[in-house]
Amino acid sequence: MSLHFLYYCSEPTLDVKIAFCQGFDKQVDVSYIAKHYNMSKSKVDNQFYSVEVGDSTFTVLKRYQNLKPIGSGAQGIVCAAYDAVLDRNVAIKKLSRPFQNQTHAKRAYRELVLMKCVNHKNIISLLNVFTPQKTLEEFQDVYLVMELMDANLCQVIQMELDHERMSYLLYQMLCGIKHLHSAGIIHRDLKPSNIVVKSDCTLKILDFGLARTAGTSFMMTPYVVTRYYRAPEVILGMGYKENVDIWSVGCIMGEMVRHKILFPGRDYIDQWNKVIEQLGTPCPEFMKKLQPTVRNYVENRPKYAGLTFPKLFPDSLFPADSEHNKLKASQARDLLSKMLVIDPAKRISVDDALQHPYINVWYDPAEVEAPPPQIYDKQLDEREHTIEEWKELIYKEVMNSEEKTKNGVVKGQPSPSGAAVNSSESLPPSSSVNDISSMSTDQTLASDTDSSLEASAGPLGCCR
């Protein structure tokens, strides 16, 4: 189906048919909703029931009905469900064995804290969090409730996007990243399966299980993101800062243009070779920044001149130029050339990317300059605790959220007429989601990803 731009420099739309999960950003009075739907607060807040979902048992509040599995990963299982209180479809993620070890427990705590703090239209936020257990001693399950979205970027990448849609999707990615960076949060796991969209072209970034608050130490484990989207400084163990996420955006943008992964390495060595074959061997100045053993290996690899960006991304790969004089192949290619830079010191920043001509046609100060999230646990990534201590911290977070819900305020709102997901309709029988904490594209290696259900998408088009 051919795509066309509905309104000149208005927000474009997508016609997508897959359900995915994301977050809410509004508030609504629980007591009002409970009254509206003839539900008492006790029924809304306190009654649970159990249902078998695949190989797992979900014990959820009775407000959540018609559970259907839509994804699984190392950190949990995701179900689609109907929320009778908010009168809309939602996604429920059950964390998988969050207290199995210190790493799992710390990751669960970090994900929960960051999701509760972040509040931006292009980033996931929690609608609800609960546990069926009533005491700390019994506590073992954590459920996160989020909005159900229409598709992830894996499906969208395979479509023929015009410049308006491509530019607008990239703009929203950058807005979300800037919001995280404003609080010193590095995402580190940006990839198509962790970015979701609605048919109105709204985009949201998923997953904070691997996000990190920026601190004094940047020498972190390199195994933090699906290999194909890992920045060179991660591959080479150099340590990294915020613009590590910009490389990932560049890889995603390049994949939108080529409809295939840019650097599909089998391992770190092959990944590095794929990068330098296309972009060229970096200069001696960059080599000096490497650790001696890594530098010795890199300097002894064959030298590549690399290809020019017009050869890497010729005009024939891009859609026809837009009527807008900034949305054309030459500008898109220029942005790619600034993001896909091996040396992070020379790579474009998120602020400069938002000001790039291919992106700034959408610039809205309210979206770009939104107040940074208030991370109340400043030592989030420096904390070290026993499993029992992590468990107690998570339990307190869950109890705090449940108390706020009982007091009458929860995130979310009933679906308006004409919403992207019509809650009056039944849930899709075979929808698919990439788990917001650990899932990735089909082409990744088994060591980097977990299983996901079969995904399919309808054609992209314009929704009225």
From Swiss-Prot:
Q: Which GO terms describe its cellular component?
A: cytoplasm; cytosol; mitochondrion; nucleoplasm; nucleus; plasma membrane
Instruction: Say if the entry is tagged with keyword Lipoprotein.
Output: yes
Locations of Low complexity compositional bias? 423-432
Query: Which CDD domains does the record cross-reference, listed alphabetically?
Result: STKc_JNK
Modification note: Dually phosphorylated on Thr-221 and Tyr-223 by MAP2K4 and MAP2K7, which activates the enzyme. MAP2K7 shows a strong preference for Thr-221 while MAP2K4 phosphorylates Tyr-223 preferentially. Weakly autophosphorylated on threonine and tyrosine residues in vitro. Palmitoylation regulates subcellular location and axonal development.
Lineage: superkingdom = Eukaryota
Q: Which UniProt keywords apply?
A: ATP-binding, Biological rhythms, Chromosomal rearrangement, Cytoplasm, Epilepsy, Intellectual disability, Kinase, Lipoprotein, Membrane, Mitochondrion, Nucleotide-binding, Nucleus, Palmitate, Phosphoprotein, Serine/threonine-protein kinase, Transferase
Where in this protein does the record put region Disordered?
405-464
What is this enzyme's EC? 2.7.11.24
Covalently attached lipid (S-palmitoyl cysteine), positions: C462, C463
Q: What is its main location?
A: cytoplasm
Its UniProt entry gives the catalysed reaction(s) as:
L-seryl-[protein] + ATP = O-phospho-L-seryl-[protein] + ADP + H(+); L-threonyl-[protein] + ATP = O-phospho-L-threonyl-[protein] + ADP + H(+)
The coenzyme or cofactor needed here is: Mg(2+)
Q: Which residues form the Protein kinase domain?
A: 64-359
Biased composition range(s): Polar residues: 433-454
Question: What SMART domains does this protein map onto?
Answer: S_TKc
Documented activity regulation: Activated by threonine and tyrosine phosphorylation by two dual specificity kinases, MAP2K4 and MAP2K7. MAP2K7 phosphorylates MAPK10 on Thr-221 causing a conformational change and a large increase in Vmax. MAP2K4 then phosphorylates Tyr-223 resulting in a further increase in Vmax. Inhibited by dual specificity phosphatases, such as DUSP1. Inhibited by HDAC9.
Q: Which residues carry this modification: Phosphotyrosine?
A: Y223
The record's PANTHER family line, in alphabetical order, gives: MITOGEN-ACTIVATED PROTEIN KINASE (PTHR24055)
Quoted from the entry, the domain comment is: The TXY motif contains the threonine and tyrosine residues whose phosphorylation activates the MAP kinases.
What protein does this entry describe?
A: Mitogen-activated protein kinase 10
What lineage is on file? Eukaryota, Metazoa, Chordata, Craniata, Vertebrata
